[in-house]
Swiss-Prot record:
Its main location: membrane. The gene is nhaA. NCBIfam families: NhaA (TIGR00773), PRK14856.1 (NF011428). Gene3D superfamilies: Na+/H+ antiporter like domain (1.20.1530.10). It is a multi-pass membrane protein. It comes from Wolinella succinogenes (strain ATCC 29543 / DSM 1740 / CCUG 13145 / JCM 31913 / LMG 7466 / NCTC 11488 / FDC 602W). This is Na(+)/H(+) antiporter NhaA. It catalyses: Na(+)(in) + 2 H(+)(out) = Na(+)(out) + 2 H(+)(in). The chain crosses the membrane at residues 27-47, 67-87, 108-128, 137-157, 166-186, 194-214, 216-236, 314-334, 343-363, 381-401, 414-434. One of its GO terms (biological process) is regulation of pH.
Length: 452
């Protein structure tokens, strides 16, 4: 495992990678909230007609007289979101191999927490919608928006322990994995066998590339596009293709870190061996060659998985998810909305606000009492409850599942209003709860210091 960790990011790299992830996701959450607010304002202002008309704009190209394309809304939800799910898949793979989910013992607690945070909200929703046309939306309150949740923790600053942040990230990664499984199993249309067979063949080729030691990302990208097309046509949501692609991206770099260190040392010595005065004015051809080789080796020593994840992170955090939020969070609130459609509103709201913390705290408590899992060091039960409240922020992932679960526009609008309301309430509740908890903890530590 130590050897694999070097492939991921070097000594101490996992912690740096995690801190960078938390930092970027936290700011992304604040930006997402801003985009959601702008979307709601646009949908309920004089711009309303233009806002909704924009997403129905057809974008594509003609082959002869045949138009191949989709609405802008579908380009965002099916194509752009595939890049987000590719990043999610890479994060899941990295966490399973090197992170907090590496090994059964380390993964047990956050995995059980995520399981509780998915099962109980689904049960709560089903209790309100059993036997109705809206029962298919049980997956909506199962999701957690990690960017929003970490954004709330960012507002609390250094008062929140790193252990709690790590737990919340680990929980969210498993939650994302659960969401992928739910989408693949429960929100799949009638399967087209031939296209499914094509998908399996292409996936086999991707696995073959990995096994053959191909480290260039270009062939994976080509086959990834073909996989997206075949999965989209076979009836499974195309974002699942992105997750499958992520799991075939190689972890091991082209050059081992020990070999890179030796080669880099030799190249630097060769660079410095040339005339210094000449080098100050114009690099000699040998020096240029050394620099080019060093640059090439620097890329080859990086894990393809981590390199791709780093490349996708800023695009996902500051473009893809904000665009998705702006395109999907806008709901025109009017007297024509029927909030009493089955039990959609209470099912989603109570599922996220109550079901999430109860499920996370309840199942982890039982697991520890039964000796199945152990709480992370430095994380108290009251912290688990606070994290459970923040996990109730469903937002983007819940909205994404809403679009798959409902075909009725009225049910979709009610679900989005419920998601936005519940996410806002869960975020505020989690913020004040953890803030008060940190304040009492600080006072207690101060008292202990005075006594000692």
């Amino acid at each position: 495992m130590a050897e694999n960790q070097d492939y991921a990011s070097g000594n101490g790299g996992i912690k740096a990678l995690l801190l960078n992830f938390i930092h970027s996701q936290s700011f992304s959450g604040i930006f997402l909230f801003f985009c959601a607010v702008v979307a709601m304002i646009s949908a309920n202002s004089a711009l309303s007609e233009s806002y909704f008309h924009l997403w129905h704009t057809e974008i594509g190209f003609f082959i002869g007289e045949t138009f191949i394309g989709m609405s802008l809304h579908h380009w965002i939800n099916d194509v752009l979101m595939s890049f987000f799910f590719l990043m999610v898949g890479l994060e899941i793979k990295r966490e399973l191999l090197f992170g907090e989910l590496a090994g059964i013992k380390r993964a047990a607690f956050p995995a059980i927490a995520a399981l509780g945070g998915m099962i109980v909200p689904a049960i709560v929703y089903t209790l309100f919608n059993f036997g109705t046309d809206s029962a298919h939306g049980f997956g909506i309150p199962m999701a957690t928006d990690i960017a929003f949740a970490l954004g709330v923790l960012l507002l609390l600053g250094d008062k929140v322990s790193l252990a709690l942040k790590v737990f919340l990230v680990s929980l969210a990664v498993v939650d994302d994995l659960g969401a992928v499984v739910v989408i693949a199993i429960f929100y799949t249309e009638d399967l087209q066998t031939l296209w499914l067979l094509y998908s399996v063949v292409i996936l086999g080729l991707l696995i073959g590339l990995n096994k053959m030691g191909v480290r260039s990302l270009f062939p994976y990208a080509i086959l990834g596009v073909l996989l997206w097309i075949t999965v989209h046509n076979c009836g499974i949501h195309a974002t699942i293709a992105a997750v499958a692609l992520a799991f075939t991206i190689p972890v091991k770099p082209k050059i081992e870190s020990e070999n890179f260190a030796q080669e880099a040392k030799e190249l630097l010595e060769r660079f410095l061996s040339h005339d210094k005065e000449r080098a100050n004015l114009l690099l000699a051809s040998e020096q240029v060659h050394s620099v080019e080789l060093l640059s090439k080796h620097s890329k080859s020593v990086q894990s393809p998985l981590v390199r791709l994840e780093h490349a996708l992170h800023p695009w996902s955090a500051y473009f893809i998810m904000p665009v998705f939020a702006f395109a999907n969070a806008g709901v025109a609130i009017s007297s024509n909305i029927h909030f009493d459609i089955d039990g959609v509103l209470p099912g989603i709201m109570l599922g996220l606000i109550v079901g999430k913390p109860v499920g996370i705290l309840g199942l982890t408590y039982l697991a520890e009492k039964m000796g199945i899992a152990t709480r992370p060091e430095g994380v108290m039960w009251i912290d688990i409850l606070g994290a459970g409240m923040l996990a109730g922020i469903g937002f983007t992932m819940s909205i994404f599942i809403t679009n798959l679960a409902f075909t009725n526009p009225e049910a979709t609008d009610v679900a989005k209003i419920a998601i936005l309301s519940a996410s806002l309430f869960a975020g505020a509740l989690g913020y004040f709860f953890i803030s008060i908890r940190c304040r009492f903890k600080k006072k207690k530590e101060a008292c202990c210091t005075i006594k000692s």
